[in-house]
């Protein structure tokens, strides 16, 4: 029996779809992924997480930490994942781990002696960008950039990206909770946690809600009546 063997539960809703994964200190034990867009993350991630928790209970594992994606990514997706992960961490009095989405793009790639620039397609010719050293440690903060003819990567650097970007580099699949769990495992073993009470996802670019034209006209109408 694995009666009290500790495991890490990873939850990812940062990009398209959602997923969960369970890992011990050495290997992935459980994973479930949904990568379509027809169903909202909010609808599925709760049930996926319950299934993962039930699986742990049935197999005698104890969830010792929660990991989630720190961002950047989908504003709504990040908020959903953060709320769920923080709720579980608070409710179970266990630590929380947050890993950069851009750092996950490097997982599984061969070693590289120079810098790696990770890019995440943000739509409309824009991207989230972050630079990492040969060991995978961030050299700067994630930024929001426009990929135009004037954009270029420093010489001798490697580019890895997700999405449809006009750059020369290595295209990788969007990361899932399996990737998150694999990377977060080292955080867990080093006890590298975030403050659950104060941590918020790194959106990089401030969220701007789009208000429909009818709502704008209604507000103008009400203001004139006041």
Annotate the PLM regions:
Residues 1-27, 38, 97-226:
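Oxyanion-binding and handling regions
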Residues 8-10, 63-69, 77, 116-119:
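Short glycine-aspartate micro-motif
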Residues 30-33:
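Short amphipathic
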Residues 36-54:
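N-terminal phosphate-binding loop and adjacent alpha-helix
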Residues 44, 79-80, 111:
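Generic recognition of short, well-ordered alpha-helical segments
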Residues 44-47, 83, 87, 104, ...:
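Short amphipathic alpha-helical face segments that pack within enzyme cores
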Residues 49-65, 153-158:
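Phosphate/pyrophosphate-binding loops at sites that engage ATP/ADP/AMP, CoA/4′-phosphopantetheine
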Residues 65-101:
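DPxDG-like acidic metal-binding loop motif
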